[in-house]
Regions:
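Short secondary-structure boundary/capping segments
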Residues: 1, 41-42, 120-123
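Active-site substrate-recognition segment that forms the wall
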Residues: 3, 7-65, 77, 81-86
Length: 166
């Protein structure tokens, strides 16, 4: 399975996030209306809040000539959508007026359909190619912790390979 998204990353001022959801998933009908899949909130240690708006892709082709306009247009569309979407949470709605955009990016991801990819497939010593991510089976599968753990596991495998080569 593969997906392409436009993500708008926002930095919000200090917000009490105790009563806020960590993720807000939109229904299929709302996704169609707003062009957004979900909102992800990232509380920071200093009480600021990161907010990532996962916008849906419209299929527009990106070229060096079209990229600046596409970035501008998607950032504007996602900013308009998020202001409507956070209305039920007054703390978020109020903080959004002081939000600082960290930019918008288009990204794609491929994911296993039913389970994590076997960790045995993470490193190919013959080709000297390895990869890591949250879609590798194991502790933290499907979460940021899984991506970090798979990176540590890959680093260990590369180190062992390097030692064995010498």
């Amino acid at each position: 399975d593969a997906s392409v998204r436009w993500n708008l990353m926002l930095e919000l001022p200090k917000v009490s996030s105790n009563h806020l959801p960590r993720q807000i998933w939109l229904t299929a009908q709302a996704q169609e209306r707003f062009g957004v899949e979900r909102l992800v909130l990232h509380p920071q240690q200093d009480q600021r809040l990161g907010l990532v708006v996962h916008g849906l892709d419209d299929g527009a082709v990106i070229t060096p000539d079209s990229q600046p306009e596409l970035l501008r247009r998607h950032e504007q569309q996602l900013m308009e959508a998020v202001s409507d979407l956070v209305q039920p949470w007054s703390a978020l709605s109020n903080a959004l007026a002081q939000a600082r955009s960290l930019g918008v990016m288009r990204w794609g991801a491929a994911q296993p359909l039913h389970q994590g990819l076997s960790a045995d497939l993470q490193w190919c010593s013959e080709a000297r190619v390895g990869f890591c991510g949250d879609w590798i089976a194991g502790q933290g599968f499907g979460m940021a912790e899984g991506a970090l753990q798979s990176a540590l596991n890959l680093a260990e495998r590369i180190a062992c390979f390097s030692v064995a080569e010498t």
